[in-house]
Amino acid sequence: LSGRLPMTSEIKAHLEIMRHRPDVRAIVHAHPPNATAFAVAREPVPKCVLPEIEMFIGELPMTPYATPGTRDFAESLVPFLRHHNAFLLASHGALTVGADPFEAYYRMETIEQYCRILILAKQIGGWTQIAPERVLDLLRIREKLGWPDRRVTQGADLCSPGVPPAGADRAGDMQPLIAEVVRRVLERLGRLPAGPREPGP
């Protein structure tokens, strides 16, 4: 690619990626709405749901928030570069890498479609994970294609959700408290019959 336009403001991040990953020749950084929805919610993207994701993307980690365009942003990617080709950027967007522009673009399109599928699935009852032993079959095929996955180890936890960045607010953790507060308010207003409280922890 060539041209006379100014360089991306994320040139520091691009150079840092290529310094740590000599195989990377193309980077796509975008803000697609569905993937970015997960990023701004800091909601870990579930694993073991769609075979195509396990085969062609693998884990989709979320990097910690850092100010765009800064050295901190570039360095926030480094711990994830060795094992991943696609990332959600907390409160920001998404980034994918590849051996050429098509591969990096394909990965971006794939994670955006996956996030869209997850959002739709949640609206009709949620998703069901594939059994870990079946996922392991997919990861072994992936390895044979030359795409090793660090989860193919003895006793690896294949399907647990990703971990959000340290300090991330998790609205989901508040749901039991919110439900209890709403129940008590409705009960006091006489709109809900008094009943036994659910046992606490």
Report each predicted region and the residues it spans.
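Glycine-rich flexible loops
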Residues: 1-194
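Intrinsic disorder/low-complexity segments
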Residues: 196-200
